[in-house]
C-alpha cells in the first residue's frame, strides 16, 4: 500500500514539474517573440507599412516566433489587390523564374513598390539576352545608365546566379543613391525569397535565426551555401 502511495506521489510530482516547465517555456517563448518584434520595430522594420497595416504585420511576426522561435524565419502579409507585401520589404524570388526569359527585368519591375518607398528610381534602360550553342548564354542589362553583364558565355542552369547577380546590381544602384537598404536572399530555387534590410536590421535578424537556409543572407554567403558561381562584377 505504501509503495503504491509513494508511486502516486512521484507521478503527481512529475506531472507538476512538466506543467511548470511548459508554463515557463511558453512564458519564455512569449517574451522572446515580443522582444524580437519590438526590436524590429525599434530598428524601423515596419516603417514603410501603412499605419493601419503595422499592427497585423507585427501580430503575424509574433505568431511565427511564438511557434518556431529561432528555428523560424521572417514572415509577412500580402495585399490581396496588389500582391505586394504590406511591409514593402519581402518578395518571392523563384530562381527558375528569374533565370528564364524576361525574369530579370520582371523582378526589377516587381520591386518598384519598394523603390518608391525608398524614394529612389531604379530604371531599366535596356535588356538583352543571347544564346550561342557553343559559347552559351550572354545577358546584359542597363540600370540607371550603368551596364551590368549578368552572364557571359554561361552554360549552366543559373537558378542561383541570376537572383544573386541582379540583386548585386540593384544593391550597387541603391548604394549610389545613398539608400541604406539592400537586398538579402533567403533560401533558393523555387522557394527563393528576398528581403530589403538595413545592415543593422540584418545583423539582428541574422543573429536571431539559426537555419542558414531560412534566414536572410548577404549575397556572397548565400552563394556559397547555394553553391553558385561567384559574383563577376
Regions found by a protein language model. Name each.
Residues 12, 16-233:
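Contiguous interface-forming segments/domains that mediate binding rather than catalysis
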Residues 1-4:
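Positively charged n-region of N-terminal signal peptides that target proteins for export
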Residues 6-10:
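Sec-dependent N-terminal signal peptides
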